[in-house]
């Protein structure tokens, strides 16, 4: 028997084909994948989503802010497309347990996630056996990266625990092989490959966040692995395991063709280049329209110019005024802090001279709050040294460290700090690149004390900023950053940006 598995991952609420920053049509969104799904689907086809549905798009943000008692648009979309199975992703925990519970209840598909527990009970099934007929069946195992506690707000996961994904899959595969009569095993993993697909060399710090390579290389019995989380796009074989990771925002559909008699498998990715499914678009149309009207709501204006990001690399080498402005807002709310730290996210567009909600949600794309941490000069230098890893030197010029864009872009892990002056020498060895660090005209000493405000993600150690995880929390500002930006702009309708050219990056 020949079966087919269709897979999406990291859809992040992108149902419609429009860019929320400028309303332009794009090759993305479930409504562009719908035609592929309809064409390929038959009685021997499974449709699976691999998590990160509830956070991301402006439609999701609007829904979670104003209409959370209604059915989530992504639940409507998954039900319309008749998904068979789905998995939880790390970002699905961003809005707390009530939102997840409602989503689980609203989605008709079977939840696979077995290694995420709530009150000691698995949130999904241990594993699923899908029978195609009396003689053919496959097992499906769903797991999510266990690193969620590193990033997530404690109150959102206070009743949750997360088992090591590799250990869970290994144990479950062994159980299935010993007790079930199936023709194959498919792992649905909201995590990615930690080794280069071609060289098998580490492509990132081996923290356990991503374990797909380890699963493929060390667990005997996996036939298919659907990966996610990394926002990468590939369809390959790893140690004989057919593995696919479709690109985020429903830009790809993963397709696995599988002969259960011979175990021959093929993998490919299809682009979101089909005609828009108008019926699906109409299904979410009223809420989409309300979200668009909200996005165009004017908030204030800049006194001079704009804060648009035209060259994101240069905006990091020479700190963009947009970063100065966001740090200005953070210091406004964290009134006990002298320093503020902020990253320019991967696809931040910046602000027009007339600022709307569309500018805010297209620029600050994550659901972060703020924390102000007390630290000494030693920890501050360690923090800056970590950010300085973003750069390298080549032929006497400042370039980017390859690990921040290959195999996946991670520009969001370069932080820029306002409130002091410092110099990064990118040709120096990692850990010795901060060659000057001055606060109010004096060199910073290891014993000096500071309070620095940063995102909740970073304060929890996200991006391997482990040096701040144990710092005293002076202020915990439970206000979403988009809300904080909007509140500040409404209170200062004609904005003056206090830009400081305080960071030098040299080769």
Residue ranges: model-predicted function:
Residues 5-11, 145-146, 293-307, 357-358, ...:
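Short, compositionally biased low-complexity segments
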Residues 49, 140-142, 188, 226-227, ...:
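Short beta-strand segments
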Residues 2, 14, 28, 32, ...:
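Feature captures C-terminal
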Residues 17-22, 154-156, 307-316, 365-369, ...:
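Glycine- and acidic
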Residues 30, 71, 97, 277, ...:
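Alpha-helix initiation and N-capping motif
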Residues 260-354, 363, 460, 490-507:
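A short C-terminal boundary segment appended to hydrolase-like catalytic domains
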């Amino acid at each position: 028997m020949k079966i087919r598995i269709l897979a999406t991952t990291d859809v992040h609420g992108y149902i419609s084909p429009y860019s929320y920053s400028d309303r332009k049509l794009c090759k993305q969104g479930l409504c562009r994948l719908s035609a592929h799904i309809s064409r390929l689907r038959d009685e021997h086809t499974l449709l699976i989503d691999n998590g990160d549905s509830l956070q991301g798009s402006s439609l999701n943000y609007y829904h979670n802010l104003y209409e959370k008692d209604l059915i989530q648009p992504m639940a409507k979309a998954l039900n319309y497309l008749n998904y068979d199975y789905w998995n939880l992703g790390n970002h699905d925990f961003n809005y707390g347990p009530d939102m997840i519970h409602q989503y689980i209840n609203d989605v008709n598909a079977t939840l696979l996630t077995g290694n995420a527990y709530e009150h000691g009970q698995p949130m999904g099934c241990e594993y699923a056996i899908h029978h195609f007929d009396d003689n053919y069946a496959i097992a499906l195992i769903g797991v999510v990266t266990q690193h969620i506690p590193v990033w997530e707000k404690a109150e959102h996961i206070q009743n949750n625990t997360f088992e090591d994904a590799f250990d869970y899959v290994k144990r479950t595969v062994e159980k299935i092989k010993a007790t079930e009569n199936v023709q194959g095993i498919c792992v649905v993993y909201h995590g990615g490959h930690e080794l280069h697909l071609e060289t098998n060399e580490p492509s990132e710090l081996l923290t356990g966040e991503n374990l797909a390579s380890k699963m493929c290389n060390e667990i005997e019995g996996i036939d298919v692995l659907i990966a996610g989380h990394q926002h990468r796009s590939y369809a390959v074989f790893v140690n004989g395991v057919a593995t696919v990771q479709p690109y985020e925002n429903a830009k790809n559909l993963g397709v696995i063709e599988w002969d259960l008699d011979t175990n021959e498998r093929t993998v490919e990715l299809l682009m979101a280049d089909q005609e828009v499914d108008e019926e699906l678009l109409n299904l979410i149309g009223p809420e989409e329209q309300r979200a668009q009207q909200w996005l165009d709501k004017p908030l204030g204006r800049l006194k001079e110019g704009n804060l648009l990001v035209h060259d994101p690399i240069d905006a990091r080498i020479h700190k963009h005024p947009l970063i100065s402005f966001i740090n200005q807002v953070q210091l406004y709310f964290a009134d006990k802090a002298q320093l503020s730290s902020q990253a320019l996210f991967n696809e931040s567009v910046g602000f027009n001279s007339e600022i709307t909600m569309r500018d805010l949600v297209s620029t600050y794309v994550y659901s972060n709050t703020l924390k102000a941490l007390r630290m000494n000069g030693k920890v501050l230098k360690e923090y800056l040294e970590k950010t300085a890893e973003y750069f390298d030197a080549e032929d006497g010029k400042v370039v980017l460290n390859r690990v921040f864009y290959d195999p996946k872009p991670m520009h969001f892990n370069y932080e820029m700090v306002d409130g002091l002056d410092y110099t990064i020498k990118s040709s120096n060895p990692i850990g010795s690149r901060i060659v000057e660090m001055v606060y109010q005209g004096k060199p910073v000493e290891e014993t000096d004390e500071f309070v620095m405000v940063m995102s909740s993600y970073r304060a929890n150690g996200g991006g391997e900023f482990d040096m701040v995880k144990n710092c005293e929390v002076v202020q915990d500002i439970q206000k979403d950053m988009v809300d904080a930006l909007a509140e500040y702009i409404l209170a200062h309708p004609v904005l003056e940006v206090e830009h400081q050219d305080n960071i030098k990056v040299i080769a």
